[in-house]
Amino acid sequence: MKLIHFKSDFFKNSLILIGGTIVAQLIPLLLQLYLRRIYTPEDFGAFSIYFNLLSVFIIFCSLRYEAAVVLPKNDVESINVLSLSLLLTFSFGLLFLIFLFFFNNEFCEWVNFPHKYAIYLYLLPFSAVLFSAYQILNYWLVRNKLFKSSAINKVSRRFFEGITQVGLGRIKSSGLFIGDFIGNLANVLSGLFQINRKSKIRMNQISLRKMKFVALKYKDFPLYNLGPTLLSSIANILPFLLINKFYSTDELGYIDLTKMVLSIPLAFISVTISQVLFQQVSENRNNGKSIVGEIKKIGLILLDISILEIIIIQLWAPFLFGFVFGEKYSLSGDFSKILVYSFVFNFITSSFSSIFIALQKIKYYSVWQTFYFVLICSLWFFKHLSLYNFLEVYVTIEVIMSLMFCILLGGIIFRYEKVIKQ
């Protein structure tokens, strides 16, 4: 029996999204060859903090209801989950903008954001709303198996983001921040166009009564998934905020390049696979079918990609970073030899995290996320170490938590398979 059926919908959908993701991520990676020469490491360090903050705030926007768009058996219910998520997102964006209007300077002090870049924080609410809105729309595309449309949107975002960052780069550092905003705007507009063209949403099916109904039906998402997901997101960015606090923004700028390179193909392909897996597992669960086959196939692919990246980074990272981005960035290559293990384990766990939601076992995932946050917070007690040793402690925590994730997920899958066979 062949390991992977290349004609299966699961494989084709994965291939479409992965292909679009790779193209979308090649755009910023190739542009780094130019951007790293016109922006300073300090610019990238500040933008890294900005982007990390954005990744936290988007969790608040829809109270995690967006993940429930795929779950309902009928489209009417799903459309109202989508509408509820968008309503919450715009409400949060408005509140966040008002907060920044009155407390911008205090917020800069709290997150240790360089004051020379403080004006760009006003873009955060707008980018958060756009980013979250597209995530909501993308779940609708995934629900309707419009994976090609989702792939096109990813490319559109990176294309317009890249053009803006290059175009404004010769003027001032604002290009990085404005480029991110323009990219998110392009993503939403492209998503709306794709939905209107291929999967029209009927406005007469939306009502406050129905939104209230789905808000109560899927209340587990804000009650049990919002808090732990927020803690997990903070845990993902906390090590880098601590580096900015304990060491320097310049060093964070070098590590930011390391993160970007290691994230391709790892982080973004994991999101892509997770979305396809989410749709497939949700469908199988609704029909009482096994999910082991898909998980085994994708697991072997992830393992192969991870091993390949580790080998390349360990053998040639400092040389490649210095040769491609400039000699001073060989330091980023040194950092990558340590951080690569964190990224490959995150790659695997992120790809399978949607299974908890699809099987409606988010409480178990929430416990893991909370424990992960607690361990990451312990990094505060290692601030006396050198930067290299600090990174080694961080990676050790990541590996331990990833192994715990695999054990927990394995137990849940085993119980599910046992139930459907009875």
Predicted features along the sequence, with ranges:
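Membrane-water interface segments that mark the loop-to-transmembrane alpha-helix transition
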Residues: S8-A24, I49-Y50, L54-S55, I59-F107, ...
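Hydrophobic alpha-helical transmembrane segments
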Residues: S48-I49, A118, Y122-P125, A151-K200, ...
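Interhelical loop/hinge segments that connect adjacent transmembrane helices in multipass membrane
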Residues: M1-F6, K116, K148, I152, ...
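Interfacial segments at transmembrane-helix termini and the short loops linking adjacent helices
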Residues: Y39-G45, N104-L124, L315-V344
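Membrane-interface junctions at transmembrane-helix termini in multi-pass inner-membrane proteins
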Residues: F11, A68-E77, V129-S156, G167, ...
